[in-house]
C-alpha cells in the first residue's frame, strides 16, 4: 500500500518541462556530444557555461538545492574544461569532463522522470 502511495505521489509530482528547459537540455546534449567527440572542446565548453546560466536560474527559482548544486557543479566543470582545453591539459580535461557528467547525472537522478525513450518530465 505504501509503495502505491509513493508511486501515485511521484506520478502527480512530475510535470512537463517548459519549452525553454527542453531547448536548454537539447543544447546541452549537442554540446556534450561534441565534447565526447573532441570537437571544438573550448568553444563547446564555453557554450555549455552559457547554457548552464539559464539552467541554474531555472533551479534557483524552483528552490531546488539539488538542481542548484548540480547546475553549479556542471558549470564549474565546463569552465575547467574550457581552461584545460585552452592549455591542452588532457588530464585536467578528463577530470573536468567527469565533473560535468557527475553534475548532469545528479540532476537527472533527482529531477528527471523517464516517460518513454524520447519523453521526460520534471519531478
Regions found by a protein language model. Name each.
Residues 105-113:
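Detector for the c-type heme attachment site
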Residues 12-101, 113-123:
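Extracytoplasmic c-type cytochrome modules immediately beyond a signal peptide or single-pass transmembrane anchor
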Residues 3-15:
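Sec/Tat signal peptide C-region and signal peptidase I cleavage site
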